[in-house]
Design a protein with these regions (language model features):
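Ferredoxin-type iron-sulfur electron-transfer modules and their immediate structural context
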Residues: 87-91, 100-257, 265-382
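Active-site cofactor/cluster-binding pocket
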Residues: 1-155, 228-232, 236
Length: 382
């Protein structure tokens, strides 16, 4: 549901059309989260509004975060562009063709996803009150601390409204270069669940930060004074290692930058896991702590980055990219940026790395807070 605040998802939907939303909430809670302009459009255009918790259903069926089959089935149930029974039959035939060699269990799991998408009780038609027609637009809060480039160009383009930008908006950017480190301003909040640090279980190996595809979980070293000045409730423990004597150790998550892949929790080698996946909304208190750790505590060069643990105390110069949740490529780029980023030049070959590395206007390559240096990146299609 984060996307309903990012994009105009109803744009182009004609009067009497149908809108299907994958929502983690029930009908009443979903209504509370919809922005007013969206409610007004639904009412004015007599839209048939449906919700389904494809996320929960996919997890219950063993499909993890995959919802596409569930949503496709729900689409056919709602639209009736072809008889639903025919759609189900064709989808299951495609499943046999695609997954038959992977075994009966995988096939049946996907069969169940098809059936779940059109099942009564899963697919819910939402009542659209007539009074929604009179709702005013929500008050838009402008953060004047956001750089001008972000407010005037990045935010507009990320909302899929780049065609609305006048040529004059690009004054100063005539050569096609964009500033580095713009991805950190997106704060997409797309995860359903994010990791919660269990301080008492942590063995301080930093493997969670090492495998994170988006640099959304990091270790920090604090002095007693820094810990005392941290937001209320901030937990830490004495850092392990003679070089780190006197410092306090903390693992910090950026909930709005996390994609919820769970790689960190999976890799945690502690006897009792030091990371437990929790609903995003329950972890929003961590956002202020993230800002404090990243901006105020910073990245201390106390130890040489000569092993996995030590490398993760270094600031990543590749962060919050648009890579898929759980990506296996980006942790390598992130690590290279931690080791050599201040003197890196990247001539990128086209592929996934060009998409998550520089989909205009977002740039995950950033600069070191101390030196202002970071990777220079360019990509040529040919």
């Amino acid at each position: 549901p984060a996307y309903i605040h990012m994009y105009d998802v109803l744009k182009g939907l004609q009067k009497g059309g149908s809108f299907l939303l994958n929502s983690i909430w029930d009908e009443e809670e979903t209504k509370k989260h919809l922005p007013n302009h969206m409610k007004r459009y639904l009412a004015e255009n007599e839209i048939n509004f449906y919700i389904i918790n494809g996320t929960k259903t996919g997890q219950e069926l063993g499909l993890g975060n995959r919802t596409n089959t569930i949503m496709q089935s729900a689409f056919f149930k709602i639209t009736n562009v072809i008889p639903y029974e025919v759609a189900v039959s064709e989808m299951k035939h495609a499943i046999d063709k695609s997954y038959g060699k992977k075994g009966e269990a995988i096939v049946n799991m996907n069969y169940a996803a098809v059936d779940a998408g059109g099942k009564e009780g899963n697919l819910i038609k939402v009542t659209v009150p007539a009074e929604w027609k009179n709702l005013p637009d929500d008050e838009i809060k402008h953060d004047e601390n956001r750089p001008e480039f972000i407010r005037n160009i990045v935010d507009v383009m990320n909302a899929q409204k780049g065609d609305d930008l006048p040529v004059s908006a690009f004054n100063g950017y005539e050569d096609g270069t964009f500033p580095a480190g713009t991805a950190k301003f997106e704060k997409r909040g797309i995860a359903v669940n994010v990791p919660e640090w269990q301080v008492e279980n942590c063995i301080q190996c930093n493997q969670c930060a090492y495998v994170c595809p988006h640099a959304a979980i990091r270790p920090f070293l604090m002095s007693d004074e820094e810990l005392a000045a941290a937001p209320a409730g901030t937990q830490a423990k004495p850092a392990i290692g003679k070089e780190l004597a006197g410092y306090k150790f903390r693992i910090q998550v950026s909930p709005l930058d996390c994609t919820g892949c769970g790689n960190c929790a999976d890799v945690c080698p502690a006897k009792t896991k030091a990371l437990v996946m929790r609903p995003l909304e329950s972890q929003m208190v961590e956002e202020n702590r993230w800002e404090y750790m990243d901006k105020k505590v910073g990245y201390k060069k106390i130890v040489e980055p000569n092993n996995v643990k030590n490398s993760q105390f270094t600031q990543p110069l590749f962060e919050f990219s648009g890579a898929c949740a759980g990506c296996g490529e980006t942790p390598y780029i992130k690590l290279i940026s931690q080791l050599f980023g201040e003197r890196m030049m990247v001539a990128n070959a086209t592929g996934c790395s060009s998409i998550y590395g520089g989909s205009a206007p977002s740039t995950p390559y950033c600069t070191n807070y101390e030196s202002g240096r970071g990777p220079a990146w360019a990509n040529s299609l040919f």
